[in-house]
C-alpha cells in the first residue's frame, strides 16, 4: 500500500515540477514585405505550465490575474534576410528569451490570445529555410 501511495505522490510531483515554465527552443517564421518571402529562424522562448486558478465568486476589489508562462528577461538578435532587393532593409530583429517565469501576460509585447497566428505563420507562399 505504501508503494502505491509513493508512486502516486511521485507522479503528482513529477507532473507539477517537471512541466514548469522554462526556456524551450522554437522555430519562428520571419517575413519582410520588401522581400516577398519568409525564412525560418531558431530561437528560444518560454513554454510550460503555471499554477493558476479561477475564482468562483468574482471580487471587484481583488482582480483575477491568470498567470502565464512568459519571459522575465529578453535580448534581441538581428538576422539578415537573404535575397531581398538592394533598396530594401534586409535586417530583421527578433526577441530571444533568456529567463522565464510565471506572471501576468504583457499585452504590449506578447500575443496573449489562445488563437494567435502562431510562430509559423507566413503571409507569403514562399518559405525558405
UniProtKB/Swiss-Prot annotation:
Q: Which Gene3D superfamilies match?
A: Cystine-knot cytokines
Q: Which Pfam families match?
A: Cys_knot
State the compartments where it is located.
Answer: Secreted
Q: In which domain of life is the source organism classified?
A: Eukaryota
Main location group: secreted
* UniProt keyword list: Disulfide bond, Glycoprotein, Hormone, Secreted, Signal
GO biological process assignments:
estradiol secretion; follicle-stimulating hormone signaling pathway; G protein-coupled receptor signaling pathway; positive regulation of bone resorption; positive regulation of gene expression; positive regulation of steroid biosynthetic process; regulation of osteoclast differentiation; regulation of signaling receptor activity
- Which residues have a glycan attached per UniProt? 25, 42
- Give the GO molecular function terms: follicle-stimulating hormone activity
Taken from the UniProt record, the cysteine pairs bridged by disulfide bonds within this chain are: 21-69, 35-84, 38-122, 46-100, 50-102, 105-112
Annotated membrane-spanning segments are: none
Write down any Gene Ontology CC term.
Answer: cytoplasm
Signal sequence annotation: 1-19
Q: Which family is this protein grouped under?
A: Belongs to the glycoprotein hormones subunit beta family.
Q: How does it assemble?
A: Heterodimer. The active follitropin is a heterodimer composed of an alpha chain/CGA shared with other hormones and a unique beta chain/FSHB shown here.
UniProt cross-references to PANTHER family, sorted A to Z = FOLLITROPIN SUBUNIT BETA, GLYCOPROTEIN HORMONE BETA CHAIN
The entry's function note states:
Together with the alpha chain CGA constitutes follitropin, the follicle-stimulating hormone, and provides its biological specificity to the hormone heterodimer. Binds FSHR, a G protein-coupled receptor, on target cells to activate downstream signaling pathways. Follitropin is involved in follicle development and spermatogenesis in reproductive organs.
Name under which the protein is recorded: Follitropin subunit beta
Task: Specify the species.
Answer: Ovis aries (Sheep)
Amino acid at each position: 500500500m505504501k508503494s502505491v501511495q509513493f508512486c502516486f505522490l511521485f507522479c503528482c510531483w513529477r507532473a507539477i515540477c517537471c512541466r514548469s515554465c522554462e526556456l524551450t527552443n522554437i522555430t519562428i517564421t520571419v517575413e519582410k514585405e520588401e522581400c516577398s518571402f519568409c525564412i525560418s529562424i531558431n530561437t528560444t522562448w518560454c513554454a510550460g505550465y503555471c499554477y493558476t486558478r479561477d475564482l468562483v465568486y468574482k471580487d471587484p476589489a481583488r482582480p483575477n490575474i491568470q498567470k502565464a508562462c512568459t519571459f522575465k528577461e529578453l535580448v534581441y538578435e538581428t538576422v539578415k534576410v537573404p535575397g531581398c532587393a538592394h533598396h530594401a532593409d534586409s535586417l530583421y530583429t527578433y526577441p530571444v528569451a533568456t529567463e522565464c517565469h510565471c506572471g501576468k501576460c504583457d499585452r504590449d509585447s506578447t500575443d496573449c490570445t489562445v488563437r494567435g497566428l502562431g510562430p509559423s505563420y507566413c503571409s507569403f507562399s514562399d518559405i525558405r529555410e
